[in-house]
Amino acid sequence: GAAATIEPLNEHLSHYETRLRNLFGAGVQACYRGPRLYDTEQTRKLVTQWVAFYKQYRQILDSDIIHLRRPDGQDWDGIMHVNPQSKRKAFISVYNPLDIAIEREIEVPLYYTGLTNKAIVKEQDKNGKEYSLARDYSISLKIRIPAKGYNWYIIE
């Protein structure tokens, strides 16, 4: 029924962007069903933006996934792609289901990235900060996620 569709797309841009962001951010190459991918110039630009994002980070997004926190609708959840052979060793996607912006200090397990001593973390691929790995190959990372939103981090 009507509640199960986001057509016309241009009237549901926020929801459509959330779907594109979740799918491409998780490295999902889906077969999209429906009459079209976009219905206006604005929706076409949105699709183009997220396809370009996926293409830019394809190598790491097509890599193995580690679940950081199980989604429960009560707090943040997230996944991390890891690839020790890639320049970008990890790609963290974090989601906030809450109506308020949140900041959390999380433990990020970096064992499967191949990193052993230090990691450089870039929020949305900007302004890298160096972290020393703990003995268990983890770092403590402060994350920020907007209300009902998403954020991502690159680890090199």
Language model features: what each stretch is:
Residues 1-128, 142-144:
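Active-site-proximal substrate-binding groove within the catalytic cores of carbohydrate-active enzymes
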Residues 132-156:
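C-terminal beta-strand-rich structural cap/linker in extracellular carbohydrate-active enzymes
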